[in-house]
From Swiss-Prot:
Subcellular location: Cell inner membrane
Keywords: ATP-binding, Cell inner membrane, Cell membrane, Membrane, Molybdenum, Nucleotide-binding, Translocase, Transport
Binding site for ATP: G33, H34, S35, G36, S37, G38, K39, S40
ABC transporter domain location: 1-235
MF terms (GO), sorted A to Z: ABC-type molybdate transporter activity; ATP binding; ATP hydrolysis activity
Phylogenetic placement of the source organism: Bacteria, Pseudomonadati, Pseudomonadota, Gammaproteobacteria, Pseudomonadales
UniProt organism field: Pseudomonas aeruginosa (strain ATCC 15692 / DSM 22644 / CIP 104116 / JCM 14847 / LMG 12228 / 1C / PRS 101 / PAO1)
E.C. no: 7.3.2.5
One Gene Ontology cellular component: plasma membrane
Protein name: Molybdenum import ATP-binding protein ModC
InterPro entries xref list: AAA+_ATPase, ABC_transporter-like_ATP-bd, ABC_transporter-like_CS, Mo/tungstate-bd_C_term_dom, ModC_ABC_ATP-bd, Molybdenum_import_ModC, Mop_domain, P-loop_NTPase
Role summary: Part of the ABC transporter complex ModABC involved in molybdenum import. Responsible for energy coupling to the transport system.
Length: 361
């Protein structure tokens, strides 16, 4: 059976973890929440490093823990890869020998990832004979990820793998994580404090608060939920994955078709082949509303939308409007004055003017 079934209950001094999740068996699921919400503890339970009094861990049909059957597979027998904030490479071994450490744990007939494939995916072929002290922080982390992949895991756990890197190094490593997502059919549980990382990498989002699941769902739907604290953040917005239809070389604009509709958006981007999927984020503060389409506007992206819901924010001046754009969620943060002037109400049809689009690549 495909899918991840995760259920834990364990009490700690001043904290209780109580998790009950059914997650997709492929793609990247992000565990997101404030410090102390239980993200890393959840990963440790999955790995068998924290034996919960009550628990179940089933990964695409393979059960590693089921307290009802008194079943507990030892951590070293669980087919998972674990990537931490620090690569934890063996300082006395070359990169090649560090990678061999992960590879030798798996019989040749059972290997799903080979050395050459892992090196190519992470772009580390030229580093194989170096010692760890001669690697940058980003290079060390890429080697650590490759070593985890070479254990041929059925599940990859990543506990804030970019937290110790500066912005430049993060920017260097994110494309490699996207390649893993695209080219390997290994489910990933990804812990992060960074909304930008989550928006760029995740397919599914789990929001944790005080050891419990506050929300779980596809990234686009969950970010658009106005009942969650994420919607009140200054950088609140939605993530959409469009399909490239064409490129205008005269203006350097890509045309993207929105999922499940004929609606299109244009973004400044280098040429991409038709059919290529491109993920982007639209922030609520960058969306304004109009009762009619203004074709004379400098704003390129104007979409017909329907009002779904209006909610108060934590400021006296603004409201948040949840919109439907051809089946795609959209958020707009506007003033209360504008709400009253436009006489907005659920079900109303109007136009969303998107002033800025952030391509997540």
């Amino acid at each position: 059976m495909d899918g991840l079934r995760l259920r834990f209950r364990r009490a700690y001094p001043g904290f209780e973890l109580d998790i009950d999740l059914a997650l997709p068996g492929r793609g990247v699921t992000a565990l997101f929440g404030h410090s102390g919400s239980g993200k890393s503890t959840c990963l440790r339970c999955i790995a068998g490093l924290e034996k919960a009094a009550e628990g179940e861990v089933t990964i695409n049909g393979e059960t590693w823990q089921d307290s009802r059957r008194n079943l507990f597979v030892a951590p070293h027998r669980r087919a998972l890869g674990y990537v931490f904030q620090d690569a934890n490479l063996f300082r006395h071994l070359t990169v090649r020998r560090n990678l061999a450490f992960g590879l030798k744990r798996i019989a040749a007939a059972e290997r799903r990832v080979e050395l050459e494939q892992a090196c190519a995916l992470l772009g580390i072929e030229h580093l194989l004979e170096r010692m760890p002290e001669r690697l940058s922080g980003g290079e060390q982390q890429r080697v650590g990820i490759a070593r985890a992949l070479l254990t041929s895991p059925r599940l990859l756990l990543m506990d804030e793998p970019l937290a110790s890197l500066d912005l430049k190094r993060k920017g260097e490593i994110l494309p490699y994580l996207e390649r893993l997502h695209e080219e390997l059919d290994i489910p990933v549980l990804y812990v992060s404090h960074s909304p930008d990382e989550v928006a760029r990498l995740a397919d599914h989002l789990v929001l944790l608060e005080n050891g419990k699941v506050r929300a779980s769902g596809p990234i686009g739907e969950t970010l658009a939920r106005v009942d969650l604290p994420l919607a009140l953040d200054d950088d609140a917005g939605v993530v959409i994955e469009g399909t490239v239809s064409d490129h205008d070389p005269a203006y350097g604009l890509l045309t993207l078709v929105l999922p499940g509709s004929a609606l299109q958006m244009r973004v400044a981007h280098a040429p991409l082949a038709p059919g290529k999927r491109l993920r982007f984020k639209v922030q609520a503060r960058d969306v304004s509303l109009n009762l009619r389409d203004d074709a004379q506007s400098s704003i390129l992206n104007r979409l017909p939308v329907r009002v779904l819901e209006l909610v108060d924010t934590d400021t006296a001046a603004h409201v948040l409007v949840r919109l439907d754009a051809g089946g795609n969620p959209l958020l707009a943060r506007i003033t209360r004055y504008s709400r009253d002037q436009l006489q907005l109400r659920p079900g109303q049809l109007l136009w969303a003017q998107i002033k800025s689009v952030a391509v997540l690549a």
